Amino acid sequence: MVGYSSHAATFKVATLSPDGSFWMKTMREAGKEVEAATDNRVTFKWYPGGVMGDDKAVLRKMRVGQLQGAALPMGELLSFFPDSQAYGIPFLFNSYEEVDYVRSQLDDALIAGFAEGGMEVLGIAEGGFGYFLTAEPVRVPADLQQQRVWVPQNDVVSARLAQSIGVTPIPLTLPDVLPGLQTGLVNT
């Protein structure tokens, strides 16, 4: 006879990803698979769209046990494993095929590095390629230097890239980007 706990566990998981987004749909599908495989002894309560606060607030809530999980951008995870920024190096990849190949070689090492830093990783999701978007034409670096350029808060790689071409980056959390655009704090 194999014994197991009949107690149910509900994992509370937060993310900035909006409800209805590809990422939330994927997380919900994965959660349903776990729920089915455990006969609903393990369930999930999702907190999308930043309702639990920004990424720093979510990490604090995880530390005190209010949340059991989160989907976080790599920049927020630097304190657990500094090499986590490897995939964010600008212009490193030329195609999604190249990304897939490199990920097949490095994901396990990243997951192990996070575990050593105290963070259990259930998966790594791609965010796609990053682009500068602005209402003003940008033809040369001097044009970009005149813009108010947003970079994700704690994204060291993006901030250093901006600085390397003479741009003073404005780091903001994702929920602060739309208000920043509306008020003119950032425009790129």
Task: Please place each PLM-identified region on the residue numbering.
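Sec/Tat signal peptide C-region and signal peptidase I cleavage site
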Residues: V2-A8
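Nucleotide donor/acceptor-binding cores
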Residues: A9-F11, Q147
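Extracytoplasmic "Venus flytrap"
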Residues: K12-E29, G49-D54
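Extracytoplasmic/secreted envelope proteins and their assembly/folding machinery
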Residues: M24-G31, K56-L59, D107, A159-A162, ...
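Extracytoplasmic small-molecule ligand-binding "clamshell" domains
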Residues: E29, E33-A37, T43-Q68, S84, ...
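Contiguous mixed-secondary-structure segments that line small-molecule binding/active-site clefts
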Residues: K32, R63, Q68, P73-I170
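Short helix-initiation/N-cap motifs at beta->coil->alpha
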Residues: Y47-R60, Q153-V157, P169-T183
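Short, intrinsically disordered, charge-balanced linker/junction segments flanking boundaries
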Residues: G184-T188
